[in-house]
A protein has these predicted regions:
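A residue-identity detector for tryptophan
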Residues: 3, 10, 35, 57-59, ...
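Charged, amphipathic alpha-helical stretches
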Residues: 1-64
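Long, hydrophobic alpha/beta structural blocks
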Residues: 37-205
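C-terminal, beta-strand-rich globular interaction domains
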Residues: 174-310
C-alpha cells in the first residue's frame, strides 16, 4: 500500500475519473475514501487523510501494523513524499464503507429515466439500509446519518420516491402527447446533471424540447421531460443562449413547461438563424455526454448485478 504526500495531505490509491459523478465517496473521521463507480465491490479505495489525529480508526481497515507504520512514517520529518506499508485489509469493513459510498452515489446520481427504463429507487429503503450499514462502522464514520433529501426543484439536493415500473409507461405516454413542434424552428438539448436536482428531469439524453412560435407574440416554448408524473419542475431556470449571448430566460412550471418571450418582432423571428441556439436548463455546468453515458451504462449493470452492493 503506497502513501503519497500531495498538497499537504497523505493519500493512497488512484482514481481514474476526474468528473465528480463518476466517483463514489464516503467521508470518515479524518479521511475521505473514494472509488471509481465501476470498480468491484471490494476494490481498494483512494484514501486521503484530512486529519491524522481524527483518523485513529485506520487500523480497523488496513490492520494495526500498517496503521502504526503509517503514523511513524508520516510523522517522520526525514520521510520523503512517498512510502509503502503492508496493509492487511479487513474485507467486511471495506465492504461496509464501499456500501456507504455506493448508497450516497445512488441518492445523488442514479439516472432515473422513464424513456431508458431506469426506475426510481426506494428512498425509504435506501435510507434504512445505509443507516444499518453505518452502524457496522460507527467508530469510523462517527455521527454519520444517511437521510433522504428534500423534494425541491430549486436546490441541488437529491430526492427519490418509490414508483412501480408500470407507471413509467404512463409517464412516457403522457410526454409523447404533450411533445411540442414548431412552425419556425425546433430543437432539443441535454442539461448537465450536475446543474439539476436529481430525479426531477428524465435522465435520458435530450430531454429538453423547444420550438419557436411567431404568433401572436414571438416566444420560445420549452417542454422538459420530467422523471415521472410526481416530479415537479417548478422553479428551474431556463436560458436561451446563442454563444455567450443570452436571448431570453424564464422558469419552468411544475409540469416542466415554459413559454419565454423573445423580445423580437415577427419579422425578426423569421430572419433569425436558430441553428446555433442552445436552451440551458438548470445551473450552467460543463459536463460531457460521455460522463452521462458512463453513468447510464453503470446503472444498467447495477440493475442486473447480484453482488453484495445490490
Amino acid at each position: 500500500m503506497k502513501w503519497t504526500l500531495k498538497d499537504g495531505a497523505w493519500s493512497s490509491g488512484v482514481i481514474s475519473f476526474s468528473e465528480f459523478p463518476l466517483i463514489q465517496a464516503v467521508e470518515a473521521r479524518g479521511a475521505l475514501l473514494e472509488w471509481n463507480i465501476d470498480e468491484p465491490e471490494r476494490s481498494r479505495p483512494r484514501i486521503t487523510i484530512t486529519d491524522e489525529d481524527e483518523c485513529d480508526w485506520l487500523w480497523e481497515l488496513i490492520g494495526e501494523p500498517a496503521h502504526v507504520e503509517f503514523v511513524q512514517s508520516a510523522q517522520n520529518p526525514n520521510m520523503r513524499k512517498a512510502f509503502n506499508v503492508a496493509a492487511q485489509w479487513n474485507l467486511e469493513t471495506l465492504l461496509a464503507l464501499r456500501k456507504l459510498a455506493h448508497g450516497q452515489w445512488l441518492r445523488d446520481w442514479w439516472p432515473t429515466s422513464a424513456v431508458d427504463g431506469v426506475p426510481k429507487l426506494s428512498d425509504e429503503g435506501l435510507v434504512r439500509e445505509m443507516n444499518d450499514v453505518a452502524m457496522q462502522v460507527e467508530t469510523i464514520v462517527d455521527g454519520y446519518q444517511f437521510s433522504r433529501t428534500e423534494d425541491t426543484s430549486v436546490s441541488l439536493n437529491r430526492t427519490r420516491d418509490n414508483q412501480a415500473q408500470s407507471d413509467y409507461a404512463l409517464v412516457a405516454g403522457t410526454v409523447q402527447e404533450c411533445a411540442i413542434t414548431g412552425p419556425i424552428f425546433s430543437g432539443t438539448s441535454s442539461p448537465a446533471w450536475q446543474g439539476l436536482p436529481a430525479h426531477v428531469v428524465d435522465a435520458t439524453e435530450n430531454p429538453v424540447q423547444w420550438h419557436v412560435e411567431a404568433a401572436p407574440n414571438p416566444v420560445l416554448d420549452i417542454q422538459v421531460l420530467l422523471a415521472d408524473k410526481q416530479s415537479n419542475g417548478e422553479g428551474l431556470e431556463v436560458r436561451v443562449l446563442r454563444g455567450p449571448e443570452e436571448l431570453a430566460h424564464g422558469y419552468l412550471d411544475k409540469r416542466g413547461f415554459a413559454s419565454v418571450p423573445l423580445g423580437l418582432t415577427v419579422a425578426e423571428v423569421w430572419l433569425q438563424d436558430w441553428t446555433d441556439v442552445v436552451v440551458q436548463v438548470g445551473v450552467d455546468v460543463k459536463e460531457s455526454q460521455e460522463v452521462r453515458n458512463r453513468i447510464r451504462a453503470f446503472a444498467q449493470e447495477r440493475l442486473r448485478a447480484r453482488d453484495r452492493l445490490s
